[in-house]
A protein has these predicted regions:
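Non-catalytic RNA-recognition surface used by pseudouridine synthases
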Residues: 1-355
Length: 355
């Protein structure tokens, strides 16, 4: 077996011929190419906005296995040539370029593939969090697409926010996550709805929350506003997915027939009311038909005059408020229509708070 002087010295074992020409049968002379990969890294670095990095080496499995076997045979404890290469290249980058190595959460990972002497770049996504307000009805939260028909509505909240952030951070794509969703014809007011955006492969990490908020408002024609925007991390997204915050709604109703006496006192009886809801008929085409148990925390009368009633309802996450009002042909029980023995029409629905 022929070894380069470096590997022969690392192994402290003299039964191998020293390599004079060609490739080392152990490390493939990868350490002789540190300067070459430094130049490649420097060229890639000009394309991205980052401050931290990590070097990786994808070495052939047989080389690493052979290295372990030789180390055991020679009786020495050594650091792998893979680690030596990563340290050598990383140290040169830190010494000559304005970047620092980060072993926990680097913004760029530069990985050399020893088998084909090529390299790859991984760019850490950027995560943003905030709350959005929807000020115009008719905007869906996610793209509204029907098979064979394409988009049937204007752009969605996820597009207004995600495309804007993606453009300003020069990303390749985005993912949008929110804490629940409001109906397409409902407004999202009050303190807004929590959301996160993941920006993939960002070439710009200069975070300007005021600029993003301004551009979202302009892009949506005033229909979507972003507040409390800040940087986040993926752990926070996973935490948000497990939370089930209560929601507070304002519902405008038209009630037919005679006035209801003592309505406020009647509604107090329904605090912490447990209801059973089957999947609403209006979404059966996209959601599985199943039974859910939910809680109406409280109901208050905000206004009641001339057959027009405005209620403020606080409910458990996942409650279908419209169906609680109308009963959805018996698919939600108990429901307000049957409990008050009224004919009712929903005029509007607003979300006031997402805790």
């Amino acid at each position: 077996m022929y070894l380069c002087p470096r590997c022969k010295e690392r192994l402290s074992y003299n039964d191998y011929s020293e390599l004079r020409e060609g490739s080392c049968e152990l490390c493939g002379n990868i350490l002789d190419h540190v300067e070459d990969y430094f130049v490649m890294f420097e060229g890639e670095a000009k394309k991205y906005d980052f401050s931290t990095f990590l070097i990786g080496l994808r070495a052939p499995k047989e080389n690493l296995t052979k290295e372990i076997e030789l180390a055991e045979k020679s009786g020495v404890k050594l650091r792998s040539y893979k680690d030596d290469f990563q340290v050598a290249l990383g140290s040169k980058i830190e010494a000559e370029l304005p970047y620092r190595a980060d072993f926990s959460r680097p913004e760029i990972v530069f990985t050399v593939n020893q088998e084909n002497m090529d390299y790859s770049i991984w760019i850490r996504p950027e995560y943003l969090k905030g709350r959005y307000l929807k000020k115009r009805r008719g905007i869906p939260q996610s793209p509204w697409i029907k098979p064979g028909k394409g988009k049937e509505r204007e752009k969605s909240i996820s597009e207004y926010i995600g495309l804007t952030a993606c453009d300003l951070l020069k990303g390749s794509d985005y993912n949008f996550y929110a804490s629940g969703r409001e109906d397409v014809d409902a407004l999202m007011l009050g303190n807004g709805r929590p959301f996160y955006v993941e920006i993939k492969n960002p070439r710009n990490r200069t975070f300007d929350p005021a600029r993003i908020s301004e551009e979202v408002l302009k892009f949506s024609g005033g229909g979507v506003e972003v507040i409390e925007l800040s940087l986040a991390n993926p752990v926070e997204i996973e935490d948000m997915k497990t939370l089930r915050p209560d929601k507070t709604y304002e519902v405008g109703l038209t009630i037919e027939g005679k006035a209801i006496d003592g309505l406020e006192e009647i509604l107090k009886k329904y605090s912490n009311l447990r209801i059973n809801q089957k999947t609403p008929r209006r979404v059966l085409n996209i959601r599985k038909d199943k039974l859910r148990e939910r809680t109406i925390r409280s109901m208050e009368v905000k206004q009641y005059k001339d057959g027009h009633l405005v209620l403020v309802i606080r409910a458990e996450a996942g409650t279908y408020i419209k169906e609680f009002i109308t009963g959805d042909n018996g698919r939600t029980v108990p429901n307000l229509k049957d409990e008050l023995d009224i004919n009712v029409k929903i005029d509007y629905l607003n979300v006031l708070e997402v805790k």
